[in-house]
Regions:
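Bacterial Sec-dependent N-terminal signal peptides
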Residues: 1-23
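Amphipathic, charged alpha-helical segments and their helix-to-coil junctions
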Residues: 21-170
Length: 170
């Protein structure tokens, strides 16, 4: 009996503790999309990526031409020359894969450029969220944009507009 009473009292007190926590929900994707500097950074990244993609496509076209030429001339080449051309093709293919990895691979040039251009903007948003949390005494701020799944959120809990005001937007 004492255990049941203790359990009921504990659950009752826990309800007050849960209700005492203040939380809010934000949508960082929505916030970032409203920031002009984020759009500019995205545009710059897209332009850079297009340039690098063109560089890779040009090298791929060159490699394809080398393969076509090799296929056409292969029967006329000596074993030594054929081996030399195969080595050239192999090296060119390897260089192309290395370039793709360097530009677009994990922690490649695009990743580094994104860090350089977007990270300061994300930090600015994070600082505004942190300031809002302190000002309004929020215990938790959840981001509904990508990371966690929020199945339902009361729109009055969404403080994205407040974060935008804190950033000077609107």
């Amino acid at each position: 009996m004492k255990k049941v009473l203790l359990l009921v009292c504990s659950m009752w007190l826990a309800t007050f503790a849960v209700n005492a926590q203040k939380y809010a929900i934000i949508d960082t994707k929505y916030i970032l999309d409203k920031l002009p500097e984020y759009s500019d950074a995205q545009r710059k990244l897209d332009d850079i990526a297009k340039g690098w993609q063109k560089e890779i496509e040009d090298q791929q076209a060159e490699l394809d031409k080398m393969y076509r030429d090799f296929d056409a001339e292969q029967v006329m080449l000596s074993d030594e020359l054929r081996k030399k051309r195969e080595d050239q093709l192999f090296n060119k293919e390897k260089a192309l894969r290395d370039l793709q990895r360097k530009r677009f691979g994990f922690e490649g040039d695009l990743f580094k450029k994104r860090q350089e251009l977007v990270k300061p903007i994300q930090d600015k948003v994070y600082n505004a969220v942190q300031k809002l949390a302190v000002q309004r005494s929020y215990d938790f701020i959840l981001d509904k944009s990508e990371g966690i799944t929020v199945i339902f959120a009361d729109p009055k809990l969404d403080k994205s507009e407040d974060v935008l005001r804190e950033l000077g937007i609107k």
